[in-house]
Regions:
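DNA transaction DNA-binding modules
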Residues: 322-447
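Long, low-complexity, charged/polar intrinsically disordered regions in eukaryotic proteins
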Residues: 302-335
Length: 447
């Protein structure tokens, strides 16, 4: 901190006069006195702000000592405490409390500020951006996918915790600049992160803090049926609950970020019989791109500024949805099939049922006898088998079977829900057909 000038000493003296005094003389060591100093001292005034994105306290003006970033540090606290001593204020606990009060009353949101300051030039870019930088096909699905992703990112900033489950996945195009596209789309490098590699990490939720666009590359590249369920569940969450260092109790942290995927694997989507609606694959091709996004980074950033400006114009109009129309949803499902893995388990179950002569099967039986497993199935594996059967019966790939309504006993597997063969009515030697229970009830017979 530079040497004090005569004006600085005069300022300190003037501020001391407005501080509450102790009965026996001297300044009272109160939180309010600390707040008064922080609001009036020329070094502190308008310098300490709560960042609503990172939920950390930032120092946003030069303070007279060496600093490496905006976030308040322990070193900053030492300098602040030293200056507070000039006012006769010596309680670190009260100074810290005053800093939190002043910061909270002077909060800001850097991304909201950025978006609100944009002025759109009227040129449409959303329909062209993914082709320009990544060689994606210019069609309605590609345009809608990017538009919904941008609008979802905007809404998450202005309405943290809003429901938004979509992940835009850029597929293929080795060296096309997929990750660079998302990094530049986040505007500032600190608003982007690709550090989310495991969902079972104890610190996973803290890794979301302060970021706007989260790229999930490794998890998408290695996704399987189990992990894709975990990713789907993770994408569906709207908040995390944890405490940050200076807090005593955990608090709900509403999500302000959106998630993006990048992979070179063409079959990155496991077969998901409940639907892969959250994952929006967009194939890219570096050879078809007009420019590489890093060829002229300044020009690319200016383009992306206008991309967000166009999206903000749509957002402010209120005329948008964060979901696909039925027609686009159908187009998406067709597109997703090109990126799905071969469903070997379904094929094995279909083949087993074709040769099976019994009248009933359950998921544990299929797990052991159709798929050849010796261990007991995990819950997600049982669920996957049920999904195969439900989808297969619905789409006609499994014929002659239906789910039985009540659980039944299976000799090797205990009481289980399962499926039973749909057979033609049994006919006896005299030509009489045996009624099913349902038919008998409909005819009023007392069975």
């Amino acid at each position: 901190m530079p040497n004090e000038s005569e004006n600085t000493r005069s300022t300190i003296s003037n501020i001391r006069k407005i501080l509450s005094q102790a009965e026996k003389g001297g300044v009272q060591n109160t939180i309010q006195n600390c707040v008064t100093v922080l609001q009036n001292d020329p070094i502190f005034a308008d310098s300490i702000r709560l960042n609503l994105l990172s939920e950390r306290i930032d120092i946003v003006k030069p303070m007279g000592w060496q600093r490496s970033g905006p976030t308040l540090t322990d070193t900053d606290m030492m300098y602040i405490l030293r200056r507070m001593e000039k006012y006769g204020l010596y309680s670190e606990k009260r100074v810290s409390a005053a800093i939190r009060i002043v910061a909270n009353e002077n909060h800001y949101h850097p991304i909201r500020d950025y978006l609100n300051d944009l002025k759109w030039d009227g040129a449409e870019r959303i329909s062209h951006a993914l082709h320009r930088f990544l060689g994606a096909v210019e069609d309605e699905l590609t345009t809608e996918a990017l538009k919904i992703f941008l609008l979802g990112a905007i809404k998450r900033v202005f309405h943290p915790g809003c429901k938004f489950e979509m992940m835009l996945c850029l597929v293929g195009g080795q060296g096309a600049g997929k990750s660079s596209f998302f990094r530049l789309l986040a505007i500032k490098d600190e608003w982007f992160s690709d550090d989310l590699r495991r969902l079972d990490d104890d610190n996973v939720f803290r890794k979301l803090q302060g970021h706007w666009i989260m790229e999930m590359s490794e998890m998408i590249a290695t996704a399987n049926a189990k992990s894709i369920e975990e990713i789907k569940s993770f994408l569906s969450k709207q908040k995390e609950t944890y405490k940050i260092p200076y807090e005593t109790h955990p608090a709900d942290r509403l999500r302000q970020c959106v998630f993006a995927g990048t992979t070179n694997r063409q079959d990155f989507l496991p077969r998901d019989r409940t639907g892969n609606r959250r994952f929006i694959p967009i194939p890219v091709d570096a050879a078809q791109a007009e420019v590489h996004i890093l060829d002229n980074e300044a020009e690319s950033r200016a383009y992306i500024d206008q991309l967000w400006a166009e999206a903000m114009t749509i957002y402010n109009s209120g005329d948008y949805k964060l979901t696909f129309s039925p027609a686009m949803q159908e187009a998406l499902q067709i597109c997703q099939k090109d990126f799905m893995q071969e469903d070997m388990q379904a094929g094995m179950i279909y083949a087993f049922l074709e040769d099976y002569t019994g009248d009933r099967v359950c998921s544990k039986q299929l797990y052991a006898e159709a798929l050849g497993n010796l261990n007991l199935p995990a819950e997600w594996e049982t669920r996957a088998i049920c999904e195969i059967m439900t989808a297969g019966i619905a789409n006609g790939e499994i014929k002659g079977w239906t789910a039985h309504k009540a659980a039944k006993r299976y000799p090797k597997y205990g009481v289980q829900k399962g499926w039973e063969r749909v057979t033609a009515a049994k006919v006896d030697a005299d030509g009489f057909a045996e009624l099913t229970d349902e038919e008998a009830q409909q005819m009023g017979f007392p069975f």
